[in-house]
Curated annotation (Swiss-Prot):
GO molecular function: 3-isopropylmalate dehydratase activity; 4 iron, 4 sulfur cluster binding; metal ion binding
Binding positions for [4Fe-4S] cluster per the UniProt entry: C349, C409, C412
Co-factor requirement: [4Fe-4S] cluster
Family assignment from sequence similarity: Belongs to the aconitase/IPM isomerase family. LeuC type 1 subfamily.
UniProt keyword annotations, A-Z: 4Fe-4S, Amino-acid biosynthesis, Branched-chain amino acid biosynthesis, Iron, Iron-sulfur, Leucine biosynthesis, Lyase, Metal-binding
Pathway(s) annotated for this protein in UniProt: Amino-acid biosynthesis; L-leucine biosynthesis; L-leucine from 3-methyl-2-oxobutanoate: step 2/4
Protein name from the UniProt record: 3-isopropylmalate dehydratase large subunit
UniProt entry tagged with the keyword Iron-sulfur: yes
The reaction(s) this protein catalyses: (2R,3S)-3-isopropylmalate = (2S)-2-isopropylmalate
Keyword Metal-binding: yes
Entry-linked InterPro entries: 3-IsopropMal_deHydase_lsu (IPR004430), Acnase/IPM_dHydase_lsu_aba_1/3 (IPR015931), Acoase/IPM_deHydtase_lsu_aba (IPR001030), Aconitase_4Fe-4S_BS (IPR018136), Aconitase_4Fe-4S_dom (IPR036008), IPM_dehydratase_rel_enz (IPR050067), IPMI_cat (IPR033941)
Length: 469
């Protein structure tokens, strides 16, 4: 009798081509996503070796990191960014890969366009030269980031040499209170386990609160698995998954969809399957959260205060948190609701989907962005932007004083014109608050879309459970 297996075990086993004497496995890769930053050297390696792309139809390319989110008719000003975009256009043409350029209405952030095109499906192995590839695990896929040399290996062979990770399960039961979202769940998880807590593991997210989430919410949680140190994050597929996937452009159709669904329904962890680590959270006890430091583990309730590093026993950790406070310009004991803001950024592969934008529009309709705040909303893709405009969301946001942009990674990272100026403080719906992440000496606070929207109007962080504008 076969031993009970986890969701991760099942997908891994289904994709092992061969196992080496050292225990490493040659893993078949179903889907490969590429963008302009981590792919140029990989394609050049193929040229030098005289190789072709093994399965061009299993790779999808898009520009996202370097594209400007303002007027695109002027082109890219930064020469290095322009070179990377031009290189990707040339590479996909030479190797026969489907490509969404900056003017394609399907263009967007790589981890948003994959799911919305139906390129991402349950049970697949999915890789990309980007750490937030874990996003696709929301569909019950094994998805993780890879390095540039591995990008070349996948292009050439459609395989990767991997070592199997350990299994970890995070169970979130209960019902989320009003004003608390998927972003708060994943920030709470990272706050609980730390940024190294998932190291060497693939996390399966389970429980009543996870099952109640939309696909957008599940993608938000899986997106930040890497911030918890995990190799990947996964949610078992269910009716919500199937409904999202069905009729997507690249999803199976008709009898092929029915056959695929029968397989997808087997993608659940068996009763009695063993996990190397288990974590449990009660969703009912979660408040809206805000990050205060320079690590995603530095989180606190909106009604909390900036912690005092002097209370930390470990000297190295204490010094690290003292450095974070100095960088952020905060003092121990300061109330989070007293922190004022210069900028608000709503977007990214964490929170740039239509559900996120609907939440923001609902929060700010009939209100105005605070005089001292510059706020921008960047849709995650051209299709998200078009849907938002069809619903009138853009009008609501622009009337409130938000800058409505073209799709791209934007201010999530300082690789394009959307950057913080030194010393500026930003409420951001993105996934990382490292030093300089959004621009040199910029200060980033991670929050949910609703929290960011309210902060834009109030000019400071507020408890959205009680906020009325």
């Amino acid at each position: 009798m076969t031993a009970p297996r986890t969701l991760y075990d099942k997908i891994w086993d289904d994709h092992v081509v061969d196992v080496g004497p050292d225990g490493s496995a040659l893993l078949y890769i179903d889907r490969h996503l590429v963008h302009e930053v981590t792919s140029p050297q990989a394609f050049e390696g193929l040229r030098v070796a005289g190789r072709k792309v093994h399965a061009p139809h299993k790779t999808l390319a898009v520009v996202d990191h370097n594209v400007q989110t303002s007027d695109r008719s002027k082109g890219i000003e930064d020469p290095e960014s322009r070179t990377q975009l031009e290189a990707l256009a040339e590479n996909v043409r030479d190797f026969g890969i489907e490509f969404y350029d900056a003017l394609d209405r399907r263009q967007g952030i790589v981890h948003i366009i994959g799911p919305e095109q139906g390129f991402t499906l349950p049970g697949q192995t999915i890789v990309c030269g980007d750490s937030h590839t874990s996003t696709h695990g929301a569909f019950g896929a094994l998805a993780h980031g890879i390095g540039t040399s591995e990008v070349e290996h996948v292009l050439a062979t459609q395989t990767l040499i991997q070592r199997k990770a350990k299994n970890m399960r995070v169970t979130v039961d209960g019902t989320l209170p009003p004003g608390v979202s998927a972003k708060d769940i994943v920030l709470a998880i990272i706050g609980e386990i730390g940024t190294a807590g998932g190291t060497g593991h693939v996390i399966e997210y389970a429980g009543e609160a996870i099952r109640a989430l939309s696909m957008e919410g599940r993608m938000t949680i899986c997106n930040m698995s890497i911030e918890g140190g995990a190799r990947a994050g996964m949610v078992a597929p269910d009716e919500i998954t199937y409904a999202y996937v069905k009729d997507r452009p690249k999803a199976p159709k008709g009898a092929a969809f029915d056959a695929a669904r029968r397989y997808w329904e087997s993608l659940v962890s068996d009763e009695g399957a063993q996990f190397d680590r288990e974590i449990r959270l009660d969703a009912a006890n979660l408040p809206p959260l805000v990050s205060w430091g320079t690590s995603p583990e530095d989180i606190v309730s909106i009604l909390g205060t900036v912690p005092d590093p002097a209370q930390i026993a470990d000297e190295n950790k204490r010094q690290s948190k003292e450095k974070a406070l100095a960088y952020m310009g905060l003092t121990p004991g300061m109330r989070m609701t007293d922190i004022t803001l210069d900028r608000v950024f709503i977007g990214s592969c964490t929170n740039g989907r239509i559900e996120d934008l609907r939440i923001v529009a609902k929060m700010v309709e009939g209100r105005k962005v605070h005089d001292g705040v510059s706020a921008m909303v960047v849709p995650g893709s051209g299709l998200v932007k078009a849907q938002a405009e069809a619903e009138g969301i853009d009008r609501i946001l622009k009337d409130a004083g938000f800058d409505w942009r073209e799709p791209g990674c934007s201010m999530c990272l300082g690789m394009n014109p959307d950057k913080l100026r030194p010393g500026e403080r930003c409420a951001s719906t993105s996934n990382r608050n490292f030093e300089g992440r959004q621009g040199p000496r910029g200060r980033t606070h991670l929050v949910s879309p609703a929290m960011a929207a309210a902060a834009a109007v109030a000019g400071r962080f507020v408890d959205i459970r009680e906020w009325r504008g």
